[in-house]
Amino acid sequence: MFCVQCEQTIRTPAGNGCSYAQGMCGKTAETSDLQDLLIAALQGLSAWAVKAREYGIINHDVDNFAPRAFFSTLTNVNFDSPRIVGYAREAIALREALKAQCLSVDANAHCDNPMADLQLVSDDLGELQRQAAEFTPNKDKAAIGENILGLRLLCLYGLKGAAAYMEHAHVLGQYDNDIYAQYHKIMAWLGTWPADMNALLECAMEIGQMNFKVMSILDAGETTKYGHPTPTQVNVKATEGKCILISGHDLKDLYNLLEQTEGTGVNVYTHGEMLPAHGYPELRKFKHLVGNYGSGWQNQQVEFARFPGPIVMTSNCIIDPTVGSYDDRIWTRSIVGWPGVSHLEGDDFGPVIAQAQQMAGFPYSEIPHLITVGFGRQTLLGAADTLIDLVSREKLRHIFLVGGCDGARGERNYFTDFATSVPDDCLILTLACGKYRFNKLEFGDIEGLPRLVDAGQCNDAYSAIILAVTLAEKLGCGVNDLPLSLVLSWFEQKAIVILLTLLSLGVKNIVTGPTAPGFFTPDLLAVLNEKFGLRSVTTVEEDMKQLLSA
């Protein structure tokens, strides 16, 4: 096992990465190794997808499957080894079908890629794990060095984050052939184990640019189906009655659950990254969507254990449900998996609803505590002139985007301390689950404009980018000249691709933490600092002083 893709990876003087019987996320060595094997199979599939496009062949089954299966290897998504192998087998079957399509056009068609003809050696998980050793990401570290390995992983993990957003967009009916062609090209190239530093740096920027387009179609999918988010108050306390908790990012799953629970007497609560759903008109119209429960994903083993109903996980992040003994009432959807946990194959939430009706639910309603969400792209753009006016009258000094992933490290208190230290004449724009570090605190307003503005999920970084570009255009300056600073927390691969997106758009002087990715070498960090001004957090006082004086 070797895995260094998330922020909580093991770090020692000898090197970074989880390489024991189990990773810090709870992923076993078996599952981790089989995920490496799956990725190799997906690289072979993408190699043939690239070849097929040369013949004008676009196989939508391949396009739909490839990012979804890649998403299953993202941190805290799928811990179920047999299902990972199932994805690998499906990848190979689709590859062979695609190969046959190519051969039907050109009998001499061939694909010059090391992964293009990969076959699984056995049905036995142990033998497959031994085969997977051929594809361990750091297998040639001694030959290529840490810097090349780090850049490879930056590209691989960044592309994995983009694949997750591609799947979210696909679920909402969004498809862009150019995006999929670019995805397959990059995925296939990474399967050649590239070792050119400049080419890898260029690839990382290409992934970032591609992801901007992915976030654009995801935004279109969400707003077309569910309307544009508008500011909405959400109760974060319990309401009396039977209940279901839904976590993750998939708004379609939430919509289906709300439709199926309507009139049943079962209330629905959002958790984690599902919180922004309350801002969408077509979701909040369901009166039994009563509130948001819990805090950051890392606290779920305590909070889920206390929740008096079933829980549905639609995407990341799931952690071991046996710790809180709620594994008999947690359900996984789509690419999510945990051994022994009930999995919903389709869109029928009937079994979950039936379980909710058999459980006690909340015995009484707590005193409401309301927070505000729903500052989506349209709302943000509608406030652009107000922001400019406040800046021109020196009522608004600075905007801080403080957001990103949450996690368990104590150092993440930095982001709470930073938010609460932001001066009263400054605004905090937030997104993703890092907001749970401070989103239930009171920040007041500036002439009626809330000082804490929740823009949505991690992918809603797109809205923040569009706002920044709009402000820069109206003020006749560059984005980097705005009174705007980005203070980002990272944990997994979606955060990595958001960072690449920002860097590829030329955004500079981003501050990130609580620690640098384990695959960032000192040399790589130095390059990113020199080129983009990217740096790690220090202390709240020092960072605040530096950002306000920039």
UniProtKB/Swiss-Prot annotation:
Annotated EC: 1.7.99.1
Catalytic reactions on record: A + NH4(+) + H2O = hydroxylamine + AH2 + H(+)
Gene Ontology BP, a term: response to hydrogen peroxide
SUPFAM superfamilies named among the record's database cross-references: Prismane protein-like (SSF56821)
Binding, hybrid [4Fe-2O-2S] cluster: 249, 273, 317, 405, 433, 458, 492, 494
Comment on bound cofactor: Binds 1 [2Fe-2S] cluster.
Primary subcellular site in the record, as a coarse category: cytoplasm
GO cellular component, one term: cytoplasm
Residues given in the record as [2Fe-2S] cluster binding sites: 3, 6, 18, 25
Keywords from the named record: 2Fe-2S, Cytoplasm, Iron, Iron-sulfur, Metal-binding, Oxidoreductase
Modified residues (Cysteine persulfide): 405
Entry keyword annotation includes Protease: no
Cofactor(s) needed by this chain: [2Fe-2S] cluster; hybrid [4Fe-2O-2S] cluster
Localization terms from the record: Cytoplasm
GO MF terms held by the record: 2 iron, 2 sulfur cluster binding; hydroxylamine reductase activity; metal ion binding; peroxidase activity
Domain of life: Bacteria
Family: Belongs to the HCP family.
Known role: Catalyzes the reduction of hydroxylamine to form NH(3) and H(2)O.
Name the record gives this protein: Hydroxylamine reductase
Organism: Salmonella enteritidis PT4 (strain P125109)
Designated gene of the protein: hcp
